[in-house]
C-alpha cells in the first residue's frame, strides 16, 4: 500500500542519483507483528532472506570493511558499498557500517532498559557527526539512511521506534524491517536473561523521505 501511494500519488517527482524519483515526506507506519521478520505476502516480498540473514549476522559481528568484503563476497551490488574511501580526504579506515556502531552501544541500551523500565533514553544512534565528511565528496560509501532507533518498555512490552532520514521503499525497506525487527528480538532476549520477562511490543517507523 505504501509503495502504491508513493508511485501513484507522489508528493514530489524529481531526478536524483538513482534516476526518476517519486517521493512522499514525513511518512510513518507500524509493523503489526515484528516477530516474523518477514514479508509474508509473495506479491510484496522482493528480497532474499538468505541474504538478509547473512547481512544481519555480519552486522551483529561488529566487523569492519575487510570482514564486510568477505561476508558479501560474490554479491557485487553489496560489495560496491563496502570499499575503502576512494579519495585521500578521508582516513583509509573510514566507513559508515552500522554494525560496529550498534555493537558498541548495545550493552548500554540493554542495561538502561533493565535498570529503568520507564526510560526514554535507550536510543541507539546510527548517524554520526563524522559522517558529514562525506557530504562534499563523490564517494561510494553510503551516508547513513538511519538516524536512530529508540527502545522503550511500556505495559511489560519492549517497543522500538526507528527514525530514517531516507528510505528506498521498493526493496531496501524490507531488509531494514528485517534487520531492525531481529535486533529488537535480540534486545528482548538479552533482557529476559537479566530477568525482565517482557513481550514484543510495537515497532513504529518514520521516514523523512520515503521514495522509489
Regions found by a protein language model. Name each.
Residues 1-212:
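Terminal, non-catalytic protein-protein interaction segments that mediate quaternary/complex assembly
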